[in-house]
Amino acid sequence: MPIELIQVKRLEPGRVRAGFSQSPPRLHHAAYVVARERIAEARDELERRGLPAFLHATMGDLDSTLHDGAPVMGHHLELHADSRALHDFFAMVRNASAGWDGNDPLRSPGA
């Protein structure tokens, strides 16, 4: 399971800043990959259930949304539209973890 460490420098606009303002040590979010043809439906369903999106990011083939689930679940939900780029990214992360013994906590991909 990939674990993501976040060090925030600056967040804008306010709804994104609020979404990242949970006090540590808390789980920030759990992420799910959703079939591209069902991603809009999944996002709409979270909105209907009272988990509004506070960040929608796209870059090339990557398409992700963070939903505010903290009041209901204690953490946010991140939805990723399934794509080759997403699988390639997590393959890079998995490959970077090979042989990691914890002595160097921050490593560059390909290191």
Question: Where on the chain are the PLM-derived regions?
Answer:
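Short acidic/glycine-enriched loop/turn segments that link adjacent beta-strands
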Residues: 59-63
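Glyoxalase I/VOC metalloenzyme domain signal
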Residues: 1-52, 68-111
